[in-house]
């Protein structure tokens, strides 16, 4: 197997590494179809990775305002992301299936259009943040979808979390119009979205990445360009698979500490100061101990991402027994009516299992 080549460069102002990774063995995705739009082709993706851990030079409010921005999807993530663009002085047009969710944005100065088609017809650059692959495909390609308004010279940036095949499908439909496409799923939940601290995992047309960069910097703290479409989606699924597995294990630890007579609050302090520290523990732990789950990332979305990640793993014959076990736990939690609670509510599935055993 040939070696992977690595090259590094530094800037005079700040230390920055650019890592170019060119594996010779293609990554083969054979995902299961999740919609009637999809078939079962084998897709080979070669990829090149670039990381940006610092913002690009900020544009002035006047410069930002020269690019008309569309934003589709005013949910728990889309709304704060669009708000940050508006507050930065961007010219923003919004759409959501439930019109009332657009009202706060219009109150801040956004325009409203009644369909994705109308948004892309009037905007230079359109972002889409939808709940799942089916919604992302429908908004882009369905009746009055984005593809019917977009055209050459414009760009479509899908920041939804979808599977690889769905992202490639949307990309093809967008690019068939002459427009450019970038997938840019985010790492981060409600609070990072509100604070403009998201991490963007982008792939697709490099010119669109460069055009969108100032707007990504408004909504996020860092961005990674991962090459061809599909790599951003794959990276996001791997990240969320790890996160979901960590949360399930953390929930077990909280309950075990209580069972043996330890103070779970002290457990949270201990893990937060050690080698396994993750912000998630100190952020979620106290509310989990109180059985309160304010929604930052809905449990149903975490389980959806676990399902998609397991499908990705199966497509390349990668064993993921830990993630598979965690996925079953999230499915149990959904069956208890916890779908719209924060994903930390997965602890309730473990409590129920303990009660049944007793």
UniProtKB/Swiss-Prot annotation:
Induction: By cold and heat stresses. Down-regulated by ozone. One of its GO terms (cellular component) is chloroplast stroma. Its EC number is 1.1.1.79, 1.1.1.n11. NADP(+) binds at residues 70-84, 161, 304. The ratio of NADPH/NADP(+) may regulate enzymatic activity. Residues 1-44 form a transit peptide. Keywords: Chloroplast, NAD, NADP, Oxidoreductase, Plastid, Stress response, Transit peptide. It is found in: Plastid, Chloroplast stroma. The active site is at 236. It comes from the Eukaryota. Catalyzes the NADPH-dependent reduction of glyoxylate to glycolate as well as succinic semialdehyde (SSA) to gamma-hydroxybutyrate in vitro. May function in redox homeostasis and play a role in oxidative stress tolerance by detoxifying glyoxylate and SSA generated in glycolate metabolism and GABA metabolism, respectively. Although GLYR2 acts as an aldo/keto reductase, it has no significant homology with either mammalian and bacterial NADPH-dependent SSA reductases. Belongs to the HIBADH-related family. NP60 subfamily. PANTHER family: CYTOKINE-LIKE NUCLEAR FACTOR N-PAC (PTHR43580:SF2), OXIDOREDUCTASE GLYR1-RELATED (PTHR43580). This is Glyoxylate/succinic semialdehyde reductase 2, chloroplastic. It comes from Arabidopsis thaliana (Mouse-ear cress). The gene is GLYR2.
């Amino acid at each position: 197997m040939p070696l992977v080549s690595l090259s590094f460069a530094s800037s005079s102002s700040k230390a920055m590494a650019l890592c170019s990774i060119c594996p010779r063995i293609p990554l083969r995705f054979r995902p299961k179809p999740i919609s009637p739009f999809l078939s079962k082709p084998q897709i080979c993706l070669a990829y090149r990775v670039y990381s940006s851990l610092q913002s690009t030079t900020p544009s002035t409010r006047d410069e930002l305002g020269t690019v008309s921005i569309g934003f589709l999807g005013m949910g728990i993530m889309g709304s704060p992301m669009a708000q940050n663009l508006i507050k930065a002085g961007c010219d923003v047009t919004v759409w959501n299936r439930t019109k009332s969710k657009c009202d706060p944005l219009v109150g801040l100065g956004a325009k409203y259009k009644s369909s994705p088609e109308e948004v892309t017809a009037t905007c230079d650059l359109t972002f889409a943040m939808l709940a799942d692959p089916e919604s992302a495909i429908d908004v882009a390609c369905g009746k009055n979808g984005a593809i019917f308004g977009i055209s050459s010279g414009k760009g479509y940036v899908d920041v939804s979390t979808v599977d690889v095949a769905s992202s490639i499908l949307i990309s093809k439909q967008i690019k068939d119009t002459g427009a450019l496409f970038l997938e840019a799923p985010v790492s981060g939940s409600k609070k990072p979205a509100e604070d403009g601290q998201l991490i963007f995992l982008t792939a697709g047309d490099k010119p669109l990445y460069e055009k969108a960069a100032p707007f990504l910097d408004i909504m996020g703290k860092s961005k990674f360009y991962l090459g061809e479409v599909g790599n951003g989606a794959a990276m996001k699924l791997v990240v969320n698979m790890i996160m979901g597995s960590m949360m399930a294990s953390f929930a077990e630890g909280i309950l075990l500490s209580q069972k043996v007579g330890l103070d779970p609050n002290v457990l949270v302090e201990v893990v937060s100061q050690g080698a396994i520290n993750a912000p998630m523990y100190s952020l979620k732990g106290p509310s989990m101990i109180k059985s309160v789950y304010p929604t930052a990332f809905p449990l149903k979305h975490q389980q959806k991402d676990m399902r998609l990640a397991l499908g990705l793993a199966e497509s390349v014959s990668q064993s993921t027994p830990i993630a598979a076990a965690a996925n079953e736990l999230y499915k149990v939690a959904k069956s208890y009516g916890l779908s719209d609670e924060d994903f930390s509510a997965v602890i309730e599935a473990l409590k129920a299992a303990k009660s049944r055993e007793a």
